[in-house]
């Protein structure tokens, strides 16, 4: 059976939905019209065929603006889309290798890590040990330190090399651009 409690909708506060004794009103061209009741402000807005939109609820008294609500909503959505487009979420990319890696293979890993860091992603460099190779963790440590040194122009160490089970790993983050 469905729950029949009322769901409070997050409706925008415009026109008749503004419930305050007094509000500060700003006209469409940015001119302050002063403090008045919502009914008086709504009458002015309707004269101009515009809406009364609550801009700041926390101000004393609350601030309302006379404007075209459809246009205002469109502008807000457009700004939100632009902000989302500019935002880049840093992913964690992984570069795997063994401690007995050949020079060319190592350079390939460094180049791919460099590409990831330049695109703004974090890089997790992992060295895997098999069998008794785990005894040579000092060689893996040296290899990760060398990789950090080779990538110091584009990245900085976020997590120092450490051993986890049969792996040794290090995390590099892109350098902050100044």
Swiss-Prot record:
Keyword Plastid: no
Coiled coil regions, renumbered to chain: none
Domain of life, source organism: Bacteria
Subcellular location: Cytoplasm
Cellular component terms per the entry's GO annotation: cytosol; membrane
Main location as per UniProt: cytoplasm
Keyword Cytoplasm attached: yes
Classification via PROSITE patterns: IF3
InterPro entries hit by this protein: T_IF-3_C_sf, T_IF-3_N_sf, Translation_initiation_fac3_CS, Translation_initiation_fac_3, Translation_initiation_fac_3_C, Translation_initiation_fac_3_N
Alphabetic keyword roster: Cytoplasm, Initiation factor, Protein biosynthesis
GO MF assignments: ribosome binding; translation initiation factor activity
Pfam families: IF3_C (PF00707), IF3_N (PF05198)
Any one GO BP annotation for this protein: ribosome disassembly
Its job: IF-3 binds to the 30S ribosomal subunit and shifts the equilibrium between 70S ribosomes and their 50S and 30S subunits in favor of the free subunits, thus enhancing the availability of 30S subunits on which protein synthesis initiation begins.
Family that this chain belongs to: Belongs to the IF-3 family.
Subunit structure of this chain's protein: Monomer.
Protein's name according to its UniProt entry: Translation initiation factor IF-3
The organism of origin for this protein: Picosynechococcus sp. (strain ATCC 27264 / PCC 7002 / PR-6)
């Amino acid at each position: 059976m469905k729950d029949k409690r009322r769901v409070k909708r997050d409706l925008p506060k415009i026109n008749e939905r503004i419930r305050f004794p007094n509000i500060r009103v700003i006209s469409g061209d940015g001119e302050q019209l002063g403090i008045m009741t919502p009914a008086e402000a709504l009458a002015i807005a309707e004269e101009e065929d515009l809406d009364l939109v609550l801009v700041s609820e926390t101000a004393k008294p609350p601030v309302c603006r006379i404007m075209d609500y459809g246009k205002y909503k469109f502008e807000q959505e457009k700004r939100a889309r632009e902000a989302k487009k500019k935002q880049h979420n840093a992913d964690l990319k992984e570069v795997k290798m063994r401690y007995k890696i050949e020079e060319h293979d190592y350079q390939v890993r460094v180049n791919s890590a460099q590409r990831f860091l330049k695109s703004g992603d974090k890089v997790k460099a992992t060295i895997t040990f098999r069998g008794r190779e785990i005894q040579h963790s000092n060689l893996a440590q040296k290899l990760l330190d060398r990789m950090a040194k080779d990538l110091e122009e584009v990245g900085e160490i976020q997590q120092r090399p450490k051993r986890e089970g049969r792996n040794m790993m290090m995390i590099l983050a892109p350098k902050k651009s100044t």
